């Protein structure tokens, strides 16, 4: 059986820009993408902690070290600069892959700098 699991999460990112006239997506500092293994053009789910909006888009790699979190296109209507968001990817895993799956989670500060990497291995099915 194939099931869908969280694969990576960027927790408490702050929106730095919003660009309605750009062609879709979210631009994220490439250093942050590397830390949680999110690739350019990968589908992401986003939750806005300020207004409860949940939506999906795809990723564009932003300038390294910039702290950039820019919602582009229609998604920009769902955020304000300064809003706190959570960005997640998911992976579809078979039963063998589920046991060793360990999501990557980066917790950010108010400047979108990584302050903690959380090992989600303790919360995986191998420990249930």
Curated annotation (Swiss-Prot):
Keywords: Autocatalytic cleavage, Cytoplasm, Decarboxylase, Lyase, Pantothenate biosynthesis, Pyruvate, Schiff base, Zymogen. Its EC number is 4.1.1.11. InterPro entries: Asp_de-COase-like_dom_sf (IPR009010), Asp_decarbox (IPR003190). GO terms for molecular function: aspartate 1-decarboxylase activity. The modification Pyruvic acid (Ser) is found at residue 25. Binds 1 pyruvoyl group covalently per subunit. Catalyzes the pyruvoyl-dependent decarboxylation of aspartate to produce beta-alanine. PANTHER family: ASPARTATE 1-DECARBOXYLASE (PTHR21012:SF0). This is Aspartate 1-decarboxylase. It comes from Staphylococcus epidermidis (strain ATCC 35984 / DSM 28319 / BCRC 17069 / CCUG 31568 / BM 3577 / RP62A).
